[in-house]
C-alpha cells in the first residue's frame, strides 16, 4: 500500500489526516497524548482497529510525559492518561482493548525502573500496530474464499487500510479477492454524514486499482433489487456476545435490504472487536456526534439554521441479519454466542 495510516517514528506518532482526504494526503505529527486524544475525537484517525492503535501509541506518549519517583505515582498518572483517551469515542471497543493492554504491560513490569517501563510501553504500542496488519491479512484470506468469481461487492463506510494498520477488514476481504484474481468490482456507499465511503473507500480502492463505483446511500436497495449486488461486507466497531454488531450508521439498513434480497451479508473484524461481556447489541453505547456534521458539509450550511438534528455515529445490526463474522481465526456462522466464545478460547 502506498500510504501509512499510523506509525511510531522518532518518539512521535505519525498519522495520515483522514479529514483532509481525498483532496490532500497530509501526515500529522503528535508528541503528546492530549493531541492524540483530540485526533481520535476529531476523526483525524477513525475505524475501530486504527483507534485502538492510536490509543496505545497515545498512552506510550503519555508515559514519556509523566514525572514520577515511584511506580504507584507513575501508574496513577498513566490511568489518568488512559481516562482522557478513553473518553474520546465510546462505541469502538478496540479503543478500550488497547488501553487495557497498555495498562497490563505496566502492571506486569512494575518492578522495573520507570524508563524501562516507558520503553516497554512504546514497544507494546508498536507491536499492536504490527499485529493488526497481520490480522487484517488473515481476515482477508478467510473472507476472499467466500467471494465468487466476478462478484459485485457492496461495502459501507470505510473498513480498509485507513481504518486499521493497513490492508483493512472489510476491504481486506476485497483486497484478498482482488489479489486472488477473482475479477471483482466494488460498490461503495458514500456514507453520510462524514462521507467515509466517498472520501476514503473510493480513494483507497482507486489507489490499488480495484474497480470501484461510488453510490449514494439510498441507491443500495435498488441495486440489490435489480441483481447488481452479489455480496455485502462491512467492518465493525463492537460485536456483542450474541453476534449483534455495532458499525457505522446505515449498516443496519444495508443488512436488512441484503436479507430481503437473499444476498449474503458478512461482518469482517478482528477478535479484539468482540465484547463478550455484553450479552447483546442493546447494551452497546452509541456515540452521538455534533449536529453540524449533518447540517453542514465542509463548513457549508445545507439545512435550515436551528433545525433539530439526530446524529448517532453507529447503529446495531441484529445477528439474525448477519450471514457470518469473518475473523483472523476463521468464519463464524450460526450460533454466534457459542461460536464466538469458542473462538476467543482458542
Swiss-Prot record:
Q: In which pathway does it act?
A: Amino-acid biosynthesis; L-methionine biosynthesis via salvage pathway; L-methionine from S-methyl-5-thio-alpha-D-ribose 1-phosphate: step 1/6
Classification via SUPFAM superfamilies: NagB/RpiA/CoA transferase-like
**Swiss-Prot/TrEMBL catalytic activity:** 5-(methylsulfanyl)-alpha-D-ribose 1-phosphate = 5-(methylsulfanyl)-D-ribulose 1-phosphate
Active site annotated at which positions?
A: 237
Broad class of enzyme this protein falls into: isomerase
* Highest taxon in the source lineage: Bacteria
Q: Which UniProt keywords apply?
A: Amino-acid biosynthesis, Isomerase, Methionine biosynthesis
Q: Does the keyword Lipoprotein apply?
A: no
Which Enzyme Commission number(s) are listed?
Answer: 5.3.1.23
Molecular function (Gene Ontology), one example = S-methyl-5-thioribose-1-phosphate isomerase activity
Q: Where is this site: Transition state stabilizer?
A: 157
One GO term under biological process is: L-methionine salvage from methylthioadenosine
* Protein residues bound to substrate: 46-48, 89, 196, 247-248
Give the family this protein belongs to, as stated in its UniProt record. Belongs to the eIF-2B alpha/beta/delta subunits family. MtnA subfamily.
Q: What does this protein do?
A: Catalyzes the interconversion of methylthioribose-1-phosphate (MTR-1-P) into methylthioribulose-1-phosphate (MTRu-1-P).
* NCBIfam families referenced in this protein's UniProt entry, alphabetically: eIF-2B_rel, PRK05720.1, salvage_mtnA
The molecule here is called: Methylthioribose-1-phosphate isomerase
Gene label: mtnA
Amino acid at each position: 500500500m502506498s500510504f501509512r495510516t499510523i506509525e511510531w517514528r522518532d518518539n512521535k506518532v505519525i498519522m495520515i489526516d483522514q479529514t483532509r482526504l481525498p483532496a490532500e494526503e497530509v501526515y500529522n505529527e503528535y508528541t503528546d497524548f492530549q493531541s492524540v486524544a483530540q485526533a481520535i475525537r476529531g476523526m483525524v484517525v477513525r475505524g475501530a482497529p486504527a483507534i485502538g492503535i492510536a490509543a496505545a501509541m497515545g498512552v506510550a506518549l503519555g508515559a514519556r510525559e509523566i514525572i514520577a519517583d515511584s511506580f504507584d505515582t507513575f501508574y496513577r498518572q498513566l490511568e489518568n492518561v488512559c481516562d482522557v483517551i478513553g473518553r474520546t469515542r465510546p462505541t469502538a471497543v478496540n479503543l478500550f482493548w488497547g488501553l487495557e493492554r497498555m495498562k497490563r504491560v505496566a502492571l506486569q513490569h512494575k518492578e522495573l525502573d520507570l524508563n524501562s517501563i516507558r520503553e516497554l510501553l512504546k514497544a507494546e504500542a508498536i507491536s499492536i500496530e504490527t499485529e493488526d496488519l497481520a490480522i487484517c491479512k488473515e481476515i482477508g484470506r478467510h473472507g476472499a474464499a467466500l467471494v465468487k468469481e466476478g462478484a459485485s461487492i457492496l461495502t459501507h463506510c470505510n473498513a480498509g487500510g485507513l481504518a486499521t494498520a493497513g490492508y483493512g477488514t472489510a476491504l481486506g476481504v476485497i483486497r484478498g479477492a482482488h489479489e486472488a484474481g477473482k475479477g471483482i468490482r466494488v460498490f461503495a456507499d458514500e456514507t453520510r454524514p462524514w462521507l467515509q465511503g466517498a472520501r476514503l473507500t473510493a480513494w483507497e480502492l482507486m489507489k490499488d486499482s480495484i474497480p470501484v463505483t461510488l453510490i449514494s446511500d439510498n441507491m443500495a436497495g435498488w441495486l440489490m433489487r435489480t441483481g447488481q449486488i452479489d455480496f455485502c461486507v462491512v467492518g465493525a466497531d463492537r460485536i456483542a456476545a450474541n453476534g449483534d454488531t455495532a458499525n457505522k450508521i446505515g449498516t443496519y439498513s444495508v443488512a436488512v435490504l441484503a436479507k430481503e434480497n437473499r444476498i449474503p451479508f458478512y461482518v469482517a473484524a478482528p477478535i479484539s472487536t468482540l465484547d463478550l461481556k455484553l450479552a447483546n447489541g442493546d447494551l452497546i453505547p452509541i456515540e452521538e456526534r455534533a449536529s453540524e456534521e449533518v447540517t453542514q458539509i465542509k463548513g457549508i450550511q445545507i439545512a435550515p439554521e436551528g433545525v433539530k438534528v439526530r446524529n448517532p455515529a453507529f447503529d446495531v445490526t441484529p445477528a439474525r441479519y448477519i450471514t457470518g463474522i469473518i475473523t483472523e481465526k476463521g468464519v463464524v456462522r450460526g450460533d454466534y454466542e457459542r461460536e464466538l466464545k469458542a473462538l476467543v478460547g482458542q
